[in-house]
Amino acid sequence: MSTGIEATWLGAADYAATYGAMKQFTLERLPETPDALWICEHAPVFTQGIAGRQDHILNPGAIPVVQTDRGGQVTFHGPGQVVAYPLIDLRRAGYFVKEYVYRIEESVLRTLAHFGVTGHRVAGAPGIYVRLDDPFSHAALTGPLPAGDPFRGLGKIAALGIKVSRHATYHGVALNVAMDLEPFSRINPCGYAGLQTVDLSTIGVQTTWEEAARVLSQKLGTYLAP
């Protein structure tokens, strides 16, 4: 199955410059413009979504905060995290935003499965989560989530935030591989106080950024296909 998506490996990329380039790409794209998939990692930066509240940024310190036009609230990007930006014409792809989000999440779930990890969706909280006590368990999340503590026993391993303009997507998804997780304690990740953030290394998966990026890129290419 092929999407015609051309993956571009940006390596270590400045966040503000990449954000500007995504917006420019989307602004200038024509009906025949090929879709793209940018893969990169960023220097430490907090990014705030359009729904973000200032009080969720607890103590940024010297880490810059960039206001963006993506959905969602505040998150952190840093070295050791694979960031993927699909630049897709949804009208040409033939599916709507809700399915687009589902397909991105499915790509992350399949990436985690490649490394033997079982990821989970949480209703109303985009992104992918793992069981802290047993990230390799294949058991589904069952029953209503605890009131006031919907993430009990879970850690967030991938964050998702998108923007759609004239049927075209930008922004994307970030998968934590082996990074300094301390900056996540300086914010309420995605607006949730106390939400624990993990990476593949924390849960016992030893892999390289390059390998995780390769697998995620492949899965996105497959699951974003029309």
Swiss-Prot record:
<keyword id="KW-0808">Transferase</keyword>
<feature type="binding site">
    <location>
        <begin position="172"/>
        <end position="174"/>
    </location>
    <ligand>
        <name>substrate</name>
    </ligand>
</feature>
<feature type="binding site">
    <location>
        <begin position="159"/>
        <end position="161"/>
    </location>
    <ligand>
        <name>substrate</name>
    </ligand>
</feature>
<keyword id="KW-0963">Cytoplasm</keyword>
<feature type="binding site">
    <location>
        <begin position="70"/>
        <end position="77"/>
    </location>
    <ligand>
        <name>substrate</name>
    </ligand>
</feature>
<dbReference type="InterPro" id="IPR000544">
    <property type="entry name" value="Octanoyltransferase"/>
</dbReference>
<feature type="site" description="Lowers pKa of active site Cys">
    <location>
        <position position="156"/>
    </location>
</feature>
<comment type="pathway">
    <text>Protein modification; protein lipoylation via endogenous pathway; protein N(6)-(lipoyl)lysine from octanoyl-[acyl-carrier-protein]: step 1/2.</text>
</comment>
<dbReference type="InterPro" id="IPR020605">
    <property type="entry name" value="Octanoyltransferase_CS"/>
</dbReference>
<comment type="similarity">
    <text>Belongs to the LipB family.</text>
</comment>
<feature type="active site" description="Acyl-thioester intermediate">
    <location>
        <position position="190"/>
    </location>
</feature>
<comment type="function">
    <text>Catalyzes the transfer of endogenously produced octanoic acid from octanoyl-acyl-carrier-protein onto the lipoyl domains of lipoate-dependent enzymes. Lipoyl-ACP can also act as a substrate although octanoyl-ACP is likely to be the physiological substrate.</text>
</comment>
<protein>
    <recommendedName>
        <fullName>Octanoyltransferase</fullName>
        <ecNumber>2.3.1.181</ecNumber>
    </recommendedName>
</protein>
<dbReference type="GO" id="GO:0005737">
    <property type="term" value="C:cytoplasm"/>
</dbReference>
<feature type="domain" description="BPL/LPL catalytic">
    <location>
        <begin position="31"/>
        <end position="226"/>
    </location>
</feature>
<dbReference type="GO" id="GO:0036211">
    <property type="term" value="P:protein modification process"/>
</dbReference>
<dbReference type="InterPro" id="IPR045864">
    <property type="entry name" value="aa-tRNA-synth_II/BPL/LPL"/>
</dbReference>
<keyword id="KW-0012">Acyltransferase</keyword>
<dbReference type="Pfam" id="PF21948">
    <property type="entry name" value="LplA-B_cat"/>
</dbReference>
<dbReference type="InterPro" id="IPR004143">
    <property type="entry name" value="BPL_LPL_catalytic"/>
</dbReference>
<dbReference type="GO" id="GO:0033819">
    <property type="term" value="F:lipoyl(octanoyl) transferase activity"/>
</dbReference>
